């Protein structure tokens, strides 16, 4: 109960702060201020917006949107934005309520709108009053499919053009050029994943379903079905049994979460642990394309 109350008070506090900040926001500069929840969206905004936008990333590299708690700085950034880019499908549960108090002229881009979503993924963020909504949300990790990202780019281009009609052609050209790069990336990943000897693997959380669907792979099991919550002993036992039945025993951990439970499971099953990064934003995988190639190289090492 204390967690519920603390979270509710946090939301109310930040909503009040956001409302107060609306009266002190300076006139926007020449560049359009864009706020993005995760690093891939921030990169997309820069690719399409070029020198016409100022992009702010809300989550620091290495943070997980599943367990993120907003700060006053986050409230301030949202209050000053013209565009707010989110994945949607319940990923940014911490932002949805604050956006009700956002400036009237802010344009919210829901990346998952209109996407062929994978159903039935649980995302319990340990807030009891959110459980029913979160557990019925589709899988939000759409950005790990490059072709779905071409749809996201179209949404960002439309939002920028609506906000800044005089530069619509500029945004359209940038979007088209980047979409072509994403299609090339898709072909590259498709060609390289076809050479994998093993096509099943265990992941830390359910981030890789869209990637697997696109490239004919299979997530055999997920360690943390609810991000931030350690799995029950019975679930751990089941994962070990699944791993023991695979030709190549691989567990993919993630830098956003502690690897201890993944390492324990791998040790019991005689498996190897590799690290995939579903969010990027760090050195060597700062851009979306760098991040995807980084993950592809890790997968090749583990599964070929």
Which residue ranges define each predicted feature?
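Bacterial N-terminal signal peptides that target proteins for export
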Residues: 2-14
